[in-house]
């Protein structure tokens, strides 16, 4: 492990301690760099907060154990009200409108880099905040850029595109310079209880329960027909909100007569007729698009790429970058044309743009371009 010179003596950093290995190692690395480190554990969810589904109590216990091991103070804060108003209600509204939202992106925007930063500033007198995200910060020409994490498989810039350079400048991302395996090795060397803790996956407020059961608690299901792209009814669905474009599993329509062995995919959701439209093969023509229109734009530098720029885009997490060209229909509407057709571009999800290793920002996919 590389030794780090303590060059930041006296600067106070509040680390978002989640009870996971990434935030644990972030706190340790910042201590080694000479920062005055304190932890802050966020409780963001209370509805149906039972032992069966919610790991918050265990996560807090692990966060406290790590802070005790490192000899730092751990604060706690309850952002459940802010989370409900700014993240969960958005999540429900998007599903109700037939789109597929990404609540993790909204959580970063409204909670981790807004409510958390404000609390760290006003209550804890922080110079910086820090999170266990796999991204990097680069300060250049008086501003701060956000770069992809070194570990390409764990890079989380897709989830942080709504940050402006002002927030990036106030944030530290120690594990963004490391591979995940290195992070776990550091945690093990330091004897941190989280060194072999499983990474959290899925949507935080759903936990281990079935997504359909959870969603039905808040939005009544509206069953309807499943049709092929040729218009033949071949099954029923329990609600369009349970399905997303490109979905293959859970359709319950295998082994049909007069069809080949290719898997079925969701290729369209007809909201007017409440019909789920499916087609066979991952390259089905109705699954492909030549571009997209994005709105609700956020640019890290607050300006965005120039009109006509050739850059790259991700339309979902861990997707290979897609070369594209971009033009503005207005200040808040961007038209994106892919160099090659892309499958399963999904309205409601985010399109995030890159110039090499620099995350430029992004927007919400509003419409697909198929011509």
UniProtKB/Swiss-Prot annotation:
Residues 154-156, 316-317 are annotated as: Interaction with tRNA. GO terms for cellular component: cytoplasm. Residues 102-104 are annotated as: Interaction with target base in tRNA. GO terms for molecular function: ATP binding; tRNA binding; tRNA-uridine 2-sulfurtransferase activity. It is an enzyme of class 2 (transferase). InterPro entries: MnmA-like, MnmA-like_C, MnmA-like_central, MnmA-like_central_sf, Rossmann-like_a/b/a_fold. The active site is at residues 107, 204. It catalyses: S-sulfanyl-L-cysteinyl-[protein] + uridine(34) in tRNA + AH2 + ATP = 2-thiouridine(34) in tRNA + L-cysteinyl-[protein] + A + AMP + diphosphate + H(+). CDD domains: MnmA_TRMU-like. It is found in: Cytoplasm. Keywords: ATP-binding, Cytoplasm, Disulfide bond, Nucleotide-binding, RNA-binding, Transferase, tRNA processing, tRNA-binding. Disulfide bonds join 107-204. GO terms for biological process: tRNA wobble position uridine thiolation. It holds the Pfam family tRNA_Me_trans. Catalyzes the 2-thiolation of uridine at the wobble position (U34) of tRNA, leading to the formation of s(2)U34. Belongs to the MnmA/TRMU family. This is tRNA-specific 2-thiouridylase MnmA. It comes from Shewanella pealeana (strain ATCC 700345 / ANG-SQ1). The gene is mnmA.
């Amino acid at each position: 492990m590389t030794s780090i010179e303590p060059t930041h003596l006296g600067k106070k950093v509040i680390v978002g301690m989640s009870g996971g290995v990434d935030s644990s190692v972030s706190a340790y690395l910042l201590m080694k760099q000479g920062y005055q480190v304190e932890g802050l554990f966020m409780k963001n969810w209370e509805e149906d907060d039972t032992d069966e589904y919610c790991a918050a109590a265990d996560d807090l216990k692990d966060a406290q154990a790590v802070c005790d091991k490192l000899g730092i103070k751990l604060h706690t804060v309850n952002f459940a009200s802010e989370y409900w108003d700014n993240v969960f209600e958005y999540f429900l509204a998007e599903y109700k409108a037939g789109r597929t939202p990404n609540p993790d992106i909204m959580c970063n925007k409204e909670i981790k880099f807004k409510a958390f930063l404000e609390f760290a500033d006003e209550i804890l007198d922080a110079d910086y905040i820090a999170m266990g995200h796999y991204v990097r910060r680069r300060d250049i020409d008086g501003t701060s850029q956000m770069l992809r994490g070194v570990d390409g498989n764990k890079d989380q810039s897709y989830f942080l595109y709504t940050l402006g350079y002002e927030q990036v400048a106030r944030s530290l991302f120690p594990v963004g310079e490391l591979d995940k395996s290195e992070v776990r090795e550091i945690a093990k060397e330091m004897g941190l209880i989280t060194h072999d803790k499983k990474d959290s996956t899925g949507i935080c407020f759903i936990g281990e329960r079935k997504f359909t059961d959870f969603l039905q608690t808040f939005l009544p299901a509206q069953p309807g027909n499943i049709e092929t792209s040729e218009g033949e009814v071949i099954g029923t669905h329990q609600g369009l909100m349970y399905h997303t474009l490109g979905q293959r599993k859970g359709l319950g329509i295998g082994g049909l007569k007069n069809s080949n062995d290719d898997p079925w995919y969701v290729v369209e959701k007809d909201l007017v007729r409440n019909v789920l439209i499916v087609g066979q093969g991952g390259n089905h023509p109705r699954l492909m698009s030549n571009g997209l229109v994005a709105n609700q734009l956020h640019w890290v530098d607050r300006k965005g790429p120039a009109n006509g720029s050739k850059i790259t885009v991700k339309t979902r997490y861990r997707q290979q970058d897609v070369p594209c060209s971009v033009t503005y229909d207005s200040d808040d509407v961007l038209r994106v044309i892919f160099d090659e057709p892309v499958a399963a571009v999904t309205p409601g999800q985010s399109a995030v743009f890159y110039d090499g290793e620099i995350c430029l920002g992004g927007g919400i996919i509003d419409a697909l371009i198929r011509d």
